Swiss-Prot record:
Cofactor requirement: Mg(2+)
Region (Disordered) location: 429-448
Entry's localization field: Cytoplasm, Cytoskeleton
Primary localisation category: cytoplasm
Gene3D superfamilies: Helix hairpin bin (1.10.287.600), Tubulin/FtsZ, C-terminal domain (3.30.1330.20), Tubulin/FtsZ, GTPase domain (3.40.50.1440)
Name used for this protein in its record: Tubulin beta-2 chain
Annotated residues for binding of Mg(2+): E69
InterPro entries linked: Beta-tubulin_BS, Beta_tubulin, Tub_FtsZ_C, Tubulin, Tubulin/FtsZ-like_C, Tubulin/FtsZ_2-layer-sand-dom, Tubulin/FtsZ_GTPase_sf, Tubulin_C
Keywords: Cytoplasm, Cytoskeleton, GTP-binding, Magnesium, Metal-binding, Microtubule, Nucleotide-binding
Amino acid sequence: MREILHIQGGQCGNQIGAKFWEVVCAEHGIDSTGRYEGDNVLQLERVNVYYNEASCGRFVPRAVLMDLEPGTMDSLRSGTYGQIFRPDNFVFGQSGAGNNWAKGHYTEGAELIDSVLDVVRKEAENCDCLQGFQVCHSLGGGTGSGMGTLLISKIREEYPDRMMLTFSVFPSPKVSDTVVEPYNATLSVHQLVENADECMVLDNEALYDICFRTLKLTTPSFGDLNHLISATMSGVTCCLRFPGQLNSDLRKLAVNLIPFPRLHFFMVGFAPLTSRGSQQYRALTVPELTQQMWDAKNMMCAADPRHGRYLTASAMFRGKMSTKEVDEQMINVQNKNSSYFVEWIPNNVKSTVCDIPPTGLKMASTFIGNSTSIQEMFRRVSEQFTAMFRRKAFLHWYTGEGMDEMEFTEAESNMNDLVSEYQQYQDATADEDGYEYEDEEEVGEEDA
């Protein structure tokens, strides 16, 4: 079967990961000890995408958990689903990365990385036909960003032909956890552009907004935010785990979504999102799902798709529904909002239909869009980076771990290049000659 190896790193990654396994366990009818409690044969049919079956009939997640301090791991282990993971797959240090990318990437993380890679190899050898890796981490801290990107580049060396999918939590525009977030995020993006195949961009502020505005939660906790993320994560891989009329996998997703190799940062959304109280007053229909799924308020990162254009998009529907209706709705969206799609990629929305809905819903959909407006995220981080870097603020923490200022300059220019590439394709039209591009690029860079 096409297995996926799940890796979670740092506090944020481990908390998202924990929630994700709760969701996947519920979908496959597996209880917190790894026993199967479900009632539907389909739950077990391809359970080995995410689980290994142990000799005693228990299902063990194909998960590698890493962190540079024991805190989050301890609370994970004592939590409801703590007993389900294989004990050897917890890899942690004692010192912590202290929100310092250099510690995660070059010093503390580098000491721990070999033991993580051993676990990854063991898990990969357990697979019949490994499809790829999914990594949960944040880009603002030290471990998820520094050590996470180190692990991604090492895995890339060892498994160059396997898909590498990341769920990356970007620093939020208004809410900041640490002062050095812009540094950590820029250094991470520099790595992700080169070494990841697909990055799902998330950020806390957009998730707070969804909890606040749509779900009507007055004081959303990280648990609520992570629940949103895990619903999306489960939606991305549902076709691998359950039978469907139109299947897709990580590679098909990449082929359909990535027109240019560097532009692989996606916005994600999930529908239906309704507040707990008003759920019973609504019947779900494909048009309703589609409408909510394409809504800008539904995007889990703080960039507005209306400020850019979609290069490509993918919609994954789950539940019993007619593919004809799905196709009609997708064509409808493209026709009504044609100005928001680039005209030089015709039919740029791929749809997937999986027959089994998520737990507790009749139908649901997951949205993944490759929109040029994601540059807003990069631009914002880049501005904050430049403001601090110009004065060399906080740099001694990084140079003290052996980093060079040159690396910062490279990361900064790579990020700015990424922004101007998005801008260039946003402005491009179908009938231009190649010559005009070059002028445009120069203009674009001056604007930027």
